[in-house]
A protein has these predicted regions:
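Short, positively charged
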Residues: 1-136, 143-152, 156-376
Length: 376
């Protein structure tokens, strides 16, 4: 009996099967194209499910699967003695990947009905979790060149499906703007906050505050951990970021590289032209931030500059080609993120932003930071 799965789940599974079938991966360019003459052979992929770990050894014609557990103390893979190894032709994974790709391209909506043939294959190879289950937020880990090579942790993004954001807003990712200028009475505040829901209600409230003589000026990061994480990029980075989010709402510009171009003109940090144009200060700081996010920085977790288990990203493009980005080529990785990310709007009610609220006698207006990858 067929079952349904989300496009995001199937996008991750497609990427995994494509790598098993191909036994290699293309390195990507900053513009999300294949980097010529730069293929990385894959010897083994490790994937975690709810009932343990699997190691998929890519041999000449087959994929050999070893079932095991990750020992918590040493973080080493230990094979299970009560489960036999199994092998399947690589062409079977190629056929399964093609089925998923066809479904992703042809079916609309968030969920897809998985055909009986694909369901049967998943049961045969004992894949029960369509998305990997890890504590370190990696989707898969890869041994390049040789099966005993050190494992490299990757997150997966697929442009054929909705993608997990690089920075998933939430109320911990709120920035506080202080309302100054005219002192608002409670009825005025209520009038601002009562503007009806719409795709542009944050912009409409900000413009209304301005029309009524109010001024919104960056004050602080709402969450102390996220504040410190941003300060690790630069002591003035929160101010720059808040100006970008403000521009996104007021001018409708969402792409990160375009927003940074506007920031260079506005120059909210009042730095010298030489620093802006010759040294590329604003671009550099944004790329630093995006790379930190891609390698594991989160709003509510203390960031000390040490990378997490995630060392790179696998990006599947709209044609089903998998591109690999790794921190060893941090320049290309950062340029790719800079050219292919955008600011997004999180839900106002859930993330608690976009309205005036009183705190210690002063009114504040919060903006929310959410960053995702563009579809194309």
């Amino acid at each position: 009996m067929a079952f349904t799965a989300t496009k995001r789940e199937l996008g991750e599974l497609y990427t995994f099967f494509r790598l098993l079938a191909d036994g290699q991966v293309n390195m990507g360019t900053a513009s999300a194209q294949i980097k010529e003459n730069d293929l990385r052979p894959i010897a083994m992929i490790q994937r975690i499910e709810h009932d343990g770990a699997r190691r998929y050894y890519i041999e000449q014609n087959d994929v050999r699967i070893v079932f095991g557990e990750i020992e918590k103390r040493t973080n080493l893979f230990v094979a299970k003695t009560d489960v036999e190894e199994t092998s399947f032709p690589r062409e079977d994974f190629d056929a399964a990947a093609s089925m998923i790709l066809s479904s992703l391209k042809s079916q609309s909506g968030e969920e897809i009905e998985v055909c009986d043939e694909l369901e049967g294959f998943l049961d045969t190879v004992r894949i029960f979790d369509l998305e990997a289950k890890t504590e370190d937020r990696t989707d898969i880990s890869i041994a390049f060149w040789h099966p005993e090579a050190p494992l490299t942790g990757f997150s997966i993004r697929c442009r054929l499906s909705p993608m997990n954001p690089l920075l998933d807003g939430g109320r911990t990712a709120n920035l506080k703007l202080e309302q100054s200028g005219v002192k608002f009475a409670v009825p005025t505040v209520n009038k601002v906050n009562a503007l009806p829901e719409s795709p542009n209600e944050v912009m409409e409230r900000m413009l209304m505050i301005e029309r009524l003589g109010g001024v919104l000026k960056y004050n602080d990061v709402a969450d102390k951990v996220f504040r410190c994480n941003l300060l690790m990029i630069d002591l003035h980075f929160p101010r720059m970021l808040s100006e970008m989010v403000r521009l996104m709402h007021l001018d409708g510009i969402t792409r990160i590289n375009e927003l940074v171009e506007h920031i260079k003109e506005i120059n909210p940090l009042k730095i010298k032209d030489e620093l802006i144009n010759k040294h590329g200060y604003y671009e550099h700081k944004m790329k630093q931030f995006l790379l930190a996010l891609a390698l594991g920085m989160r709003p509510a977790k203390i960031y000390n500059g040490t990378d997490s288990a995630i060392e790179g990203m696998l990006m599947t493009n709209g044609d089903g080609v998998v591109l690999c980005y790794h921190k060893s080529d941090s320049q290309t990785f950062a340029d790719f993120l800079f050219q292919n990310t955008r600011l997004e709007k999180g839900p106002l009610e859930k993330d608690k932003y976009g309205f005036l609220e009183r705190e210690n006698g002063t009114y504040y207006f919060k903006l929310n930071v959410k960053i995702g990858l563009v579809k194309r």
